[in-house]
Amino acid sequence: METTNFGFVASLLFVGIPTIFLIGLFISTQDGEKSSFYSDSSKGKLGPKR
């Protein structure tokens, strides 16, 4: 019983964490404000180096 429960929790975490990450990434991309802020910080870091 414990092994089955552990397997269920492990699979739930294994599937759930990437799903939550992808949903958060999708929301931040859709938001626009966060996406542009992320792009600005990336350009700011890459710009001065090159």
UniProtKB/Swiss-Prot annotation:
Segments traversing the membrane: 7-27
Alphabetical list of Pfam families matching this protein: PsbM
Entry membrane topology: Single-pass membrane protein
Keyword Chaperone: no
Keyword hit for Membrane: yes
Key words of the record: Membrane, Photosynthesis, Photosystem II, Reaction center, Thylakoid, Transmembrane, Transmembrane helix
InterPro entries: PSII_PsbM, PSII_PsbM_sf
SUPFAM superfamilies: Photosystem II reaction center protein M, PsbM (SSF161033)
Record-level GO cellular component terms: photosystem II; plasma membrane-derived thylakoid membrane
Location(s) in or outside the cell: Cellular thylakoid membrane
Record-level GO BP terms: photosynthesis, light reaction
Domain of life of the organism encoding this protein: Bacteria
Subunit-structure text: PSII is composed of 1 copy each of membrane proteins PsbA, PsbB, PsbC, PsbD, PsbE, PsbF, PsbH, PsbI, PsbJ, PsbK, PsbL, PsbM, PsbT, PsbX, PsbY, Psb30/Ycf12, peripheral proteins PsbO, CyanoQ (PsbQ), PsbU, PsbV and a large number of cofactors. It forms dimeric complexes.
Described purpose of this protein according to its UniProt entry: One of the components of the core complex of photosystem II (PSII). PSII is a light-driven water:plastoquinone oxidoreductase that uses light energy to abstract electrons from H(2)O, generating O(2) and a proton gradient subsequently used for ATP formation. It consists of a core antenna complex that captures photons, and an electron transfer chain that converts photonic excitation into a charge separation. This subunit is found at the monomer-monomer interface.
Matches recorded under NCBIfam families: PRK14094.1 (NF010694), PS_II_psbM (TIGR03038)
Name of the protein in its database record: Photosystem II reaction center protein M
